[in-house]
Amino acid sequence: MADPENTVLVLGLGDLGQRVVDVLSHRPGGRLVAAARDAEHARSVAGQAALVAALCGGPRTVEPAVVDLAEPDTIAELLVRLQPDVIVLTASRLTWWRVPERARVLPYGAWLPLHVTLVRSLMEARNAARVAAPVVALPFPDAVGPVLAGAGLAPETGAGNVLEMATKLAVVVAERAGVTLEAVDVRLVAHHATERIAFSAFGGLGGDEGGPIGPPPLHAGVSVSGEAMPDDEVRELLTAAYPLLSGPATHELTAAATAATVWALLSDQPRRLHVPAPAGRPGGYPVRVSRAGIELDLPPDMKEADAIAVNAVAARWDGIERIEPDGAFVYCRWVSDALERTLGVRIERVEPAESDAIADDLEARLARV
C-alpha cells in the first residue's frame, strides 16, 4: 500500500476482518476502507484503525463504509463509489470456530455451501459495477474458488492456508540450518486439508467421522542456499509440532497472510508468495504476485496439471469427493452419511442452482443442534 492513491476495501468486520484491518493499518498506503453491515461497528473499527495508522505510519486515510453483503446491488454501488484497487472479503455465513460442538464431527468441507454464497454475491456485484480490482476471498478459498470458476465467478485469489504452511517451513528450516529466511526457498503445493497436520491448532477441522487413511497428498520442495533438502526431511518438518494459539487468535496469522497478499497485489515488482485458489484452481500453490496479476511459480519438476491433481485429491480429506467443471460438487460418501446422522439431512451432490437453498437449510439445522 505504498502508493498514496491506492484504495483497499475490506468487506466484513467480524473477528478476522477486524484483524485484517488492523494489520493493514500498520503499513504506509493510501486509503483503507472498513465495511460492515452495522454502521456503528464499521465506524468503531475504522476509527481505531485510523489511530493505529497515525501512530505507526499506516495508510493516509482510514474510513468506514456500510454494506449488506447479501445484496449485490448495494455492494456494486459501494464499488462504483470507492473504485478500490484491491477488495478483501473476510465474511462468511459460518465461522469455523463457531460450529456447534455436536456438528464438529463433520469435516470443514461439509459447510461449503455456506461459504459460497457471499463470495458469489461479491463477484456478481463486481461484474455489475465493472470494477477491475482483484478480489482476495478468505472463506474456504481452496474449494470456493473452483466451485465458482465454473460460472466465471472465481475470485483472483484467496489468502492464508498454504502461505501459513509455507511460512512455517521457511521459519523452521532457517532456524535449523542457521541461515536467514532469504536463504530458504520453499515451494509448496498443498490443500487447506493439509493445514491440520501442519498445525495441531486446526486439528478439529477434519471432524472425526471417518475419512481417508493417512495424510492428504502434497508436493513440497525446499532448498537452502541452493541445496535441495531431502523430501522425507521436508515432510517431517512440515508435520512437526509447532506452537500456535488456539481458536480465533489464529486469525492474526491469517490476517498477516492476507496483508502480504494485498501488498503483493499492489506492488509493481512481482513478489514470491503462496496463495490458495489462484484463478479458481483447487488448493494452494507457489506464485508470483504483482499489480499485473498472479502467475504460478511451481517447482521445476512439476507441471500445472499435476499440481492441480494433487490438490483435487487432497480435497477428499476435507470431505469433498470432487468439484465438477460447472461448479457442482460431490461430497464424499462418509460426509453424506455423517450429515444424515448429525443434522438429519442427506446431501450427496450440490448443483450450482441449489447451493443457496442448501446453505439456508444447513444454517437452520445448525441453529437447532
Residue ranges of predicted features:
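NAD(P)-cofactor binding segment of oxidoreductase domains
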Residues: 104-130
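Long, compositionally biased stretches enriched for glycine and/or charged residues
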Residues: 178-369
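Glycine-rich phosphate-binding loop and adjoining beta1-alpha1-beta2 segment
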Residues: 31-59
